[in-house]
Amino acid sequence: MEFYASLKSIAMHVPSERVKNAEFQQFLDTSDEWIEKRTGIKERRFASNEEKSSDLGVIAAKQAIERAHLTPKDIDLVVVATLSPDFLAMPSTACVLSAKLGIENKPAFDISAACTGFIYLLSVAKAYVESGMCENVLIVGAEKTSSVLDFKDRGTCILFGDGAGACVIGRTKRLKESILDVQISANGNFSNYLYTPRTLKPTPFNAKEEALEPFLCMKGNEVFKLAVKTLLKDVEMILEKNALKPEDVRLFIPHQANFRIIQAVREHLDFKDEQVVLTVHKYGNTSAASIPMAMGEAYEEGRLKKGDLMLLDAFGGGLTWGSALVYFGG
Protein backbone atom coordinates (compact mmCIF):
# COMPACT_ATOMS: atom_id res chain seq x y z
CA MET A 1 0.00 0.00 0.00
CA GLU A 2 1.37 3.42 -0.97
CA PHE A 3 -0.52 5.26 1.75
CA TYR A 4 -2.99 4.87 4.61
CA ALA A 5 -6.15 6.79 5.45
CA SER A 6 -5.53 9.33 8.20
CA LEU A 7 -7.78 11.43 10.43
CA LYS A 8 -6.29 14.84 9.66
CA SER A 9 -8.62 17.11 11.64
CA ILE A 10 -11.58 17.17 13.99
CA ALA A 11 -14.10 19.86 14.99
CA MET A 12 -17.40 20.00 16.83
CA HIS A 13 -20.32 22.37 17.29
CA VAL A 14 -23.33 22.54 19.60
CA PRO A 15 -26.32 24.90 19.66
CA SER A 16 -26.34 27.62 22.29
CA GLU A 17 -29.54 26.63 24.14
CA ARG A 18 -28.86 24.55 27.26
CA VAL A 19 -31.75 22.42 28.53
CA LYS A 20 -31.28 21.14 32.06
CA ASN A 21 -33.02 18.07 33.47
CA ALA A 22 -35.25 20.13 35.75
CA GLU A 23 -36.94 21.72 32.74
CA PHE A 24 -38.55 18.39 31.85
CA GLN A 25 -40.39 18.44 35.19
CA GLN A 26 -42.69 21.11 33.74
CA PHE A 27 -44.43 18.61 31.46
CA LEU A 28 -43.23 15.11 32.47
CA ASP A 29 -43.40 12.96 35.58
CA THR A 30 -39.64 13.05 36.16
CA SER A 31 -36.92 14.85 38.09
CA ASP A 32 -33.32 15.96 37.76
CA GLU A 33 -32.25 13.21 40.19
CA TRP A 34 -34.20 10.49 38.35
CA ILE A 35 -32.67 11.36 34.97
CA GLU A 36 -29.09 11.75 36.19
CA LYS A 37 -29.15 8.54 38.25
CA ARG A 38 -30.31 6.42 35.30
CA THR A 39 -28.38 8.07 32.48
CA GLY A 40 -25.61 10.30 33.81
CA ILE A 41 -27.10 13.20 31.83
CA LYS A 42 -27.35 16.63 33.49
CA GLU A 43 -28.17 18.78 30.46
CA ARG A 44 -28.25 18.77 26.67
CA ARG A 45 -28.35 21.32 23.82
CA PHE A 46 -31.36 21.88 21.58
CA ALA A 47 -31.25 23.70 18.25
CA SER A 48 -33.67 26.50 17.39
CA ASN A 49 -36.69 25.95 15.15
CA GLU A 50 -34.81 27.56 12.25
CA GLU A 51 -31.71 25.36 12.57
CA LYS A 52 -31.42 22.03 10.78
CA SER A 53 -28.88 19.22 11.03
CA SER A 54 -26.99 20.62 8.04
CA ASP A 55 -26.69 24.02 9.76
CA LEU A 56 -25.03 22.41 12.77
CA GLY A 57 -22.87 20.22 10.56
CA VAL A 58 -21.62 22.99 8.30
CA ILE A 59 -20.17 24.94 11.23
CA ALA A 60 -18.18 21.91 12.40
CA ALA A 61 -17.23 21.07 8.80
CA LYS A 62 -15.82 24.52 8.05
CA GLN A 63 -13.60 24.35 11.11
CA ALA A 64 -12.45 20.80 10.32
CA ILE A 65 -11.48 21.83 6.77
CA GLU A 66 -9.62 24.86 8.09
CA ARG A 67 -7.78 22.78 10.70
CA ALA A 68 -6.69 20.39 7.95
CA HIS A 69 -5.18 23.42 6.12
CA LEU A 70 -7.51 22.85 3.19
CA THR A 71 -10.32 24.67 1.41
CA PRO A 72 -13.73 23.26 0.44
CA LYS A 73 -12.43 22.91 -3.13
CA ASP A 74 -9.93 20.30 -1.87
CA ILE A 75 -12.71 17.97 -0.67
CA ASP A 76 -13.37 15.03 -3.01
CA LEU A 77 -16.32 13.43 -1.20
CA VAL A 78 -18.81 14.43 1.51
CA VAL A 79 -20.56 11.80 3.64
CA VAL A 80 -23.00 12.61 6.43
CA ALA A 81 -24.40 10.30 9.11
CA THR A 82 -27.69 11.39 10.65
CA LEU A 83 -31.00 10.05 11.96
CA SER A 84 -32.51 13.55 11.75
CA PRO A 85 -31.99 14.58 8.11
CA ASP A 86 -33.06 17.97 6.77
CA PHE A 87 -35.54 16.25 4.44
CA LEU A 88 -37.44 12.98 4.83
CA ALA A 89 -36.09 11.11 1.81
CA MET A 90 -34.34 13.55 -0.51
CA PRO A 91 -32.19 15.44 -1.03
CA SER A 92 -29.57 13.98 1.26
CA THR A 93 -28.28 16.14 4.09
CA ALA A 94 -24.81 15.64 2.58
CA CYS A 95 -25.94 17.38 -0.62
CA VAL A 96 -27.43 20.28 1.36
CA LEU A 97 -24.31 20.60 3.49
CA SER A 98 -22.05 20.47 0.43
CA ALA A 99 -23.92 23.37 -1.12
CA LYS A 100 -23.58 25.41 2.07
CA LEU A 101 -19.82 24.79 1.95
CA GLY A 102 -19.64 25.82 -1.71
CA ILE A 103 -18.65 22.32 -2.83
CA GLU A 104 -19.95 21.55 -6.32
CA ASN A 105 -19.69 18.62 -8.72
CA LYS A 106 -18.38 16.25 -6.03
CA PRO A 107 -20.19 13.15 -4.74
CA ALA A 108 -22.19 13.47 -1.53
CA PHE A 109 -24.43 10.98 0.26
CA ASP A 110 -25.88 10.09 3.66
CA ILE A 111 -25.40 7.02 5.82
CA SER A 112 -28.22 5.72 8.02
CA ALA A 113 -26.71 3.75 10.89
CA ALA A 114 -28.19 5.74 13.79
CA CYS A 115 -25.82 6.07 16.73
CA THR A 116 -23.19 3.90 15.01
CA GLY A 117 -23.13 6.33 12.09
CA PHE A 118 -19.69 7.79 12.77
CA ILE A 119 -18.01 4.36 12.85
CA TYR A 120 -19.66 3.62 9.50
CA LEU A 121 -18.37 6.97 8.20
CA LEU A 122 -14.82 6.04 9.16
CA SER A 123 -15.17 2.71 7.36
CA VAL A 124 -16.40 4.38 4.15
CA ALA A 125 -13.79 7.16 4.23
CA LYS A 126 -10.97 4.69 4.88
CA ALA A 127 -12.04 2.60 1.88
CA TYR A 128 -12.30 5.58 -0.48
CA VAL A 129 -8.92 7.01 0.51
CA GLU A 130 -6.94 3.76 0.60
CA SER A 131 -8.39 2.65 -2.74
CA GLY A 132 -7.04 5.84 -4.30
CA MET A 133 -10.49 7.03 -5.33
CA CYS A 134 -10.31 10.12 -3.09
CA GLU A 135 -7.57 12.20 -1.52
CA ASN A 136 -9.65 14.16 1.00
CA VAL A 137 -12.97 12.98 2.41
CA LEU A 138 -15.17 15.11 4.67
CA ILE A 139 -17.23 13.06 7.13
CA VAL A 140 -19.87 14.68 9.32
CA GLY A 141 -22.11 13.41 12.10
CA ALA A 142 -24.90 15.98 12.40
CA GLU A 143 -28.02 15.64 14.49
CA LYS A 144 -31.08 17.66 15.40
CA THR A 145 -32.54 14.76 17.37
CA SER A 146 -34.98 17.15 19.04
CA SER A 147 -36.87 17.16 15.72
CA VAL A 148 -37.73 13.44 16.01
CA LEU A 149 -38.50 13.24 19.74
CA ASP A 150 -41.90 12.70 21.34
CA PHE A 151 -41.83 15.04 24.32
CA LYS A 152 -44.62 13.03 25.96
CA ASP A 153 -42.38 9.94 26.08
CA ARG A 154 -40.25 10.07 29.22
CA GLY A 155 -38.22 7.07 28.07
CA THR A 156 -36.73 8.85 25.05
CA CYS A 157 -37.01 12.64 25.08
CA ILE A 158 -34.79 13.08 28.16
CA LEU A 159 -31.92 11.16 26.57
CA PHE A 160 -31.09 13.06 23.41
CA GLY A 161 -29.46 16.31 22.36
CA ASP A 162 -28.41 18.20 19.24
CA GLY A 163 -24.93 18.81 17.85
CA ALA A 164 -22.41 17.98 15.15
CA GLY A 165 -18.86 16.76 14.67
CA ALA A 166 -16.76 16.71 11.50
CA CYS A 167 -13.45 15.22 10.35
CA VAL A 168 -11.29 15.39 7.27
CA ILE A 169 -9.82 12.03 6.27
CA GLY A 170 -6.72 12.27 4.10
CA ARG A 171 -3.55 10.35 3.31
CA THR A 172 -0.44 9.41 5.26
CA LYS A 173 2.51 7.09 4.75
CA ARG A 174 2.90 6.57 8.50
CA LEU A 175 1.03 3.68 10.10
CA LYS A 176 0.94 5.49 13.46
CA GLU A 177 -0.96 8.38 11.90
CA SER A 178 -3.54 6.12 10.26
CA ILE A 179 -7.04 4.78 10.77
CA LEU A 180 -5.61 1.48 11.93
CA ASP A 181 -8.77 -0.62 11.85
CA VAL A 182 -12.54 -0.30 11.63
CA GLN A 183 -15.08 -3.06 12.14
CA ILE A 184 -18.81 -2.59 11.60
CA SER A 185 -21.76 -4.94 11.89
CA ALA A 186 -25.55 -5.12 12.06
CA ASN A 187 -28.47 -7.40 12.88
CA GLY A 188 -31.79 -6.36 11.40
CA ASN A 189 -33.67 -8.96 13.44
CA PHE A 190 -33.72 -6.35 16.22
CA SER A 191 -34.87 -3.45 14.03
CA ASN A 192 -38.01 -2.99 16.15
CA TYR A 193 -35.93 -2.22 19.26
CA LEU A 194 -35.01 1.29 18.10
CA TYR A 195 -36.71 2.98 15.16
CA THR A 196 -38.49 6.04 13.77
CA PRO A 197 -41.70 5.18 11.85
CA ARG A 198 -42.69 7.02 8.70
CA THR A 199 -45.74 9.27 8.83
CA LEU A 200 -48.53 7.39 7.07
CA LYS A 201 -51.86 8.87 6.00
CA PRO A 202 -54.92 7.35 4.32
CA THR A 203 -54.94 7.63 0.53
CA PRO A 204 -57.66 7.10 -2.12
CA PHE A 205 -56.10 3.67 -2.68
CA ASN A 206 -55.67 2.67 0.96
CA ALA A 207 -58.21 4.29 3.24
CA LYS A 208 -57.25 1.98 6.11
CA GLU A 209 -53.64 3.15 6.27
CA GLU A 210 -52.58 3.45 9.91
CA ALA A 211 -51.64 6.95 11.10
CA LEU A 212 -48.20 7.02 12.74
CA GLU A 213 -46.21 9.83 14.29
CA PRO A 214 -42.59 10.18 13.05
CA PHE A 215 -41.08 10.05 16.55
CA LEU A 216 -38.15 7.97 17.74
CA CYS A 217 -39.27 4.78 19.51
CA MET A 218 -37.09 2.61 21.74
CA LYS A 219 -37.30 -0.51 23.89
CA GLY A 220 -34.91 0.91 26.45
CA ASN A 221 -34.20 -2.12 28.66
CA GLU A 222 -33.68 -4.45 25.72
CA VAL A 223 -31.36 -1.99 23.97
CA PHE A 224 -29.35 -1.47 27.16
CA LYS A 225 -28.75 -5.20 27.69
CA LEU A 226 -27.82 -5.84 24.06
CA ALA A 227 -25.57 -2.77 23.91
CA VAL A 228 -23.46 -3.82 26.90
CA LYS A 229 -23.14 -7.43 25.75
CA THR A 230 -22.35 -6.54 22.13
CA LEU A 231 -19.90 -3.70 22.82
CA LEU A 232 -17.87 -5.74 25.31
CA LYS A 233 -17.40 -8.46 22.72
CA ASP A 234 -16.74 -6.02 19.87
CA VAL A 235 -14.10 -3.99 21.72
CA GLU A 236 -12.30 -7.12 22.90
CA MET A 237 -12.31 -8.42 19.32
CA ILE A 238 -10.73 -5.34 17.72
CA LEU A 239 -8.03 -5.10 20.39
CA GLU A 240 -7.15 -8.79 20.07
CA LYS A 241 -7.18 -8.60 16.27
CA ASN A 242 -4.57 -5.82 16.39
CA ALA A 243 -2.50 -7.38 19.22
CA LEU A 244 -3.26 -4.45 21.52
CA LYS A 245 -4.22 -4.12 25.17
CA PRO A 246 -6.31 -1.42 26.87
CA GLU A 247 -3.15 0.20 28.25
CA ASP A 248 -1.90 0.72 24.67
CA VAL A 249 -4.83 3.07 24.01
CA ARG A 250 -4.37 6.76 24.77
CA LEU A 251 -8.09 7.62 24.74
CA PHE A 252 -11.21 5.47 24.91
CA ILE A 253 -14.03 7.46 23.23
CA PRO A 254 -17.32 5.54 23.29
CA HIS A 255 -20.67 6.60 21.91
CA GLN A 256 -22.16 8.87 24.57
CA ALA A 257 -25.56 7.23 25.06
CA ASN A 258 -25.74 6.37 28.73
CA PHE A 259 -23.14 6.58 31.49
CA ARG A 260 -24.04 3.09 32.74
CA ILE A 261 -23.25 1.50 29.36
CA ILE A 262 -19.95 3.38 29.15
CA GLN A 263 -19.08 2.40 32.72
CA ALA A 264 -19.77 -1.29 32.07
CA VAL A 265 -17.33 -1.41 29.14
CA ARG A 266 -14.80 0.76 30.97
CA GLU A 267 -14.76 -1.43 34.08
CA HIS A 268 -14.59 -4.66 32.09
CA LEU A 269 -11.49 -3.48 30.22
CA ASP A 270 -10.06 -1.66 33.25
CA PHE A 271 -9.59 1.71 31.56
CA LYS A 272 -8.21 4.45 33.80
CA ASP A 273 -10.04 7.74 34.34
CA GLU A 274 -7.57 9.69 32.22
CA GLN A 275 -8.16 7.34 29.27
CA VAL A 276 -11.93 7.82 29.07
CA VAL A 277 -13.61 10.78 27.34
CA LEU A 278 -17.05 11.59 28.75
CA THR A 279 -19.44 14.22 27.40
CA VAL A 280 -22.82 12.54 27.97
CA HIS A 281 -23.41 14.61 31.11
CA LYS A 282 -23.23 17.85 29.08
CA TYR A 283 -24.72 16.94 25.72
CA GLY A 284 -26.81 13.79 26.20
CA ASN A 285 -27.03 11.29 23.36
CA THR A 286 -26.30 13.13 20.11
CA SER A 287 -26.47 9.93 18.06
CA ALA A 288 -24.10 9.95 15.05
CA ALA A 289 -22.54 13.20 16.29
CA SER A 290 -21.57 11.97 19.75
CA ILE A 291 -18.18 10.40 18.99
CA PRO A 292 -16.81 13.21 16.77
CA MET A 293 -18.13 15.73 19.30
CA ALA A 294 -16.29 13.94 22.11
CA MET A 295 -13.16 13.73 19.96
CA GLY A 296 -13.44 17.42 19.14
CA GLU A 297 -13.78 18.37 22.78
CA ALA A 298 -10.78 16.22 23.74
CA TYR A 299 -8.76 17.95 21.02
CA GLU A 300 -9.80 21.43 22.13
CA GLU A 301 -8.96 20.60 25.75
CA GLY A 302 -5.48 19.39 24.75
CA ARG A 303 -6.17 15.76 25.69
CA LEU A 304 -5.91 14.53 22.08
CA LYS A 305 -2.58 15.07 20.34
CA LYS A 306 -1.01 13.98 17.08
CA GLY A 307 -0.05 10.31 17.15
CA ASP A 308 -2.42 9.41 20.00
CA LEU A 309 -4.26 6.10 19.57
CA MET A 310 -8.02 6.24 20.13
CA LEU A 311 -10.42 3.35 20.64
CA LEU A 312 -13.95 4.20 19.49
CA ASP A 313 -17.11 2.14 19.89
CA ALA A 314 -20.81 2.63 19.20
CA PHE A 315 -24.16 0.84 19.17
CA GLY A 316 -27.38 2.05 17.59
CA GLY A 317 -30.61 1.43 15.73
CA GLY A 318 -30.63 -1.23 13.07
CA LEU A 319 -29.37 -2.71 15.22
CA THR A 320 -25.89 -1.58 14.25
CA TRP A 321 -22.59 -1.52 16.08
CA GLY A 322 -18.91 -1.01 15.44
CA SER A 323 -15.52 -0.05 16.78
CA ALA A 324 -12.38 1.57 15.46
CA LEU A 325 -8.71 2.04 16.33
CA VAL A 326 -7.59 5.43 15.09
CA TYR A 327 -4.31 7.29 15.40
CA PHE A 328 -4.82 11.03 15.32
CA GLY A 329 -2.94 12.23 12.26
CA GLY A 330 -3.48 15.93 12.82
Curated annotation (Swiss-Prot):
Q: InterPro entries from the xrefs?
A: ACP_syn_III_C, ACP_syn_III_N, FabH, Thiolase-like
Q: Using the UniProt record, name the top-level EC class of this enzyme in a single word.
A: transferase
- Known EC number: 2.3.1.180
Annotated GO CC locations = cytoplasm
Active site, renumbered: 115, 255, 285
Q: What is its main location?
A: cytoplasm
SUPFAM superfamilies in the cross-refs = Thiolase-like (SSF53901)
| NCBIfam families the record matches | fabH, PRK09352.1
PANTHER family reported for this sequence: 3-OXOACYL-[ACYL-CARRIER-PROTEIN] SYNTHASE 3, BETA-KETOACYL-[ACYL-CARRIER-PROTEIN] SYNTHASE III
Q: What family, per the record?
A: Belongs to the thiolase-like superfamily. FabH family.
- Know the name of this protein? Beta-ketoacyl-[acyl-carrier-protein] synthase III
Q: Which organism is it from?
A: Helicobacter pylori (strain G27)
**Gene (UniProt):** fabH
